[in-house]
Swiss-Prot record:
Similarity comment text for this entry: Belongs to the CobB/CobQ family. CobQ subfamily.
Gene Ontology MF term list: ABC-type vitamin B12 transporter activity; catalytic activity
CDD domains attached to this UniProt entry: CobQ_N, GATase1_CobQ
Active-site residues annotated for this sequence: C332, H435
UniProt protein name: Cobyric acid synthase
Naturally occurring in which organism (per UniProt): Listeria monocytogenes serotype 4b (strain F2365)
Biological or metabolic pathway of the protein: Cofactor biosynthesis; adenosylcobalamin biosynthesis
Keywords noted in UniProt: Cobalamin biosynthesis, Glutamine amidotransferase
Amino acid sequence: MVKQIMIQGTASDAGKSVLVAGLCRLFKNKGKRVVPFKSQNMSLNSFITATGDEMGRAQVFQAEAAGVFPDVRMNPVLLKPTNDRQSQVIFMGAILDNMDAVTYHDFKQTLIPKIQAVYQSLADENDIIVLEGAGSPAEINLNDRDIVNMGMAKMVDAPVVLVADIDKGGVFASIYGTIMLLNEEERARIKGVIINKFRGDVALLQPGIDMIEELTNVPVIGVIPYANLQLEEEDSVSLSGKNYVPDSNALLDIAIICLPRISNFTDFHSLEIQPEISLRYIRNLADFGKPDLVIIPGSKNTLEDMAFLEESGLKKAIQNFAENAGKVIGICGGYQMLGKKMLDPNQVESKQLEIAGLGLLDTETIFLDQKRTTQITGVTHSGEAVEGYEIHMGETKRGESTSPFCEIKAVNGNEETHQDGAISVNKNIIGTYIHGIFDNDVFLGNLFDELLTRKNKSVYPHEIINLKEHKEQEYDKLAALLEANIQMDQLEKIMKGEKICVSTQKPAIKE
């Protein structure tokens, strides 16, 4: 019979996703067949599986940590906000509809038996399932129809460990408030608490641990030290802490336009881990500076984000940058914005029927009702072999003054040839639908060399850090960190359904 443990949090960005990934790697290293599971994920960071199904990126990196291929069953429901009131609802990798919050709140009850069936199919194939909740279980206005926190735990009778982020402050209030806002049945499901991102001497924390255990009668089974691990961040909340000031000591200054509806910002994780590269996010005109490369990322609402560029003055700044021989790369929605105009006659993305683009590429995009979701391999215009994935509802046509960026050779593992993207005559402006393009080492190294040559400097002096190899190392570091700082004997008892009590054995933090 499958063992299970659910990680819920006191808030978004408390560390649930990372903790699930770490536990998956820890159990994998012990020889267990383990998979992650999150019934419903709201995120604009998504991935396309080998079968062409769309799922949340968080469950992808958790699957990697577990040593298994991403499977859409690990995240059956994906919500992708299109604006502040509506989301695209995706079930088992395929679009169902666009729904507002009220409509979806009523609709999601119909998903319960389907979610249960999906979960059971994973349970039949594995030894352990590590479930992840969303946000906080104490959203009392939503709990009557919850399918991702206590509602999910109840569906499969999973024990819960609550994780709280001490780095933001107010950790004991968040633990107590979360637990006390739950009803008696839900409260009984919380078998342990983990305090995350602690800095300092745990002895100073101990009086608070003693008091919170007495107040809640729930044991604190771990205190995880703050660790500077280079892992993908899935939650858009994490963007608020991203750098916007260039590093004057770096070889290259790369600026990403932080769109209001930015999607798939995990595309830039490969850039973040490279030595002597300054990666920053531009939120307004004052942040623009003098970058060596500007990247316009993907967007879940390209037309509205294009309007943001116009209103903020960033449109003119990007155009001026390009006119002065600046290098600009657009990914997916960013590619669409580089063109002359975008048309949305069926109002697929917004109520705007048409909007002018940046005009840096001789292209036009029309939005269609059908989404393209594929994994691809191909060869770029300069001969680099690349792989990645596509997620878009737009069809972009190139004009005569552009050439294709990439010749696609295979789609979802099957031989299929077509052209992707566009390049300007002077080669300074590139647009592509390929997410993950920067994860290709040769392409990235050549890009760095080109940018440095433009500055009359020698080629990039470092070997490109391979993202897959780097992540494997980070997953192992994370697993070791958790094993050293969680009372694993207590966690094992929780997973077996054994009762554990508040004890005198206190967590001792280990680096």
